[in-house]
UniProtKB/Swiss-Prot annotation:
Part of the 30S ribosomal subunit. Contacts proteins S3 and S10. Keywords: Ribonucleoprotein, Ribosomal protein, RNA-binding, rRNA-binding. This is Small ribosomal subunit protein uS14. It comes from Prochlorococcus marinus (strain MIT 9312). Belongs to the universal ribosomal protein uS14 family. PROSITE patterns: RIBOSOMAL_S14. The lineage of its organism: Bacteria, Bacillati, Cyanobacteriota, Cyanophyceae, Synechococcales.
Length: 100
């Protein structure tokens, strides 16, 4: 189980990403469309003025059951240990153990 403070920090980051997503997207579109270097610099400063934790790449993909940050399968949102355990218990519909 991950530390509660780390899980809370990640939840806070997800909220910030959602809050600033539209503003960040519009600024990035302006930045990519701008041709003048001074205009690009000004837009870049506006992007830098946004909270650092509002960038989507700062959000860590975590297991929703344990909060572990590593070995997380995107399709399920579970870490490998929980995925194996729940698949064996039949709690994941459509997941079967492979054999050939």
């Amino acid at each position: 189980m991950a530390k509660k403070s780390m899980i809370a920090r990640d939840v806070k980051r997800k909220k910030l990403v959602k809050k600033y997503a539209a503003k960040r997207k519009s600024l990035l579109d302006e930045f990519n469309a701008a041709k003048d270097p001074m205009e690009r610099l000004e837009i870049h400063r506006k992007i830098q003025a946004l909270p650092r934790n509002s960038a989507p790449n700062r959000v860590r993909n975590r297991c929703w059951a344990t909060g572990k940050p590593r070995g997380v399968y995107r399709d399920f949102g579970l870490c490998r240990n929980q995925l194996r355990q729940r698949a064996h218990n039949g709690e994941l519909p459509g997941v079967v153990k492979s054999s050939w």
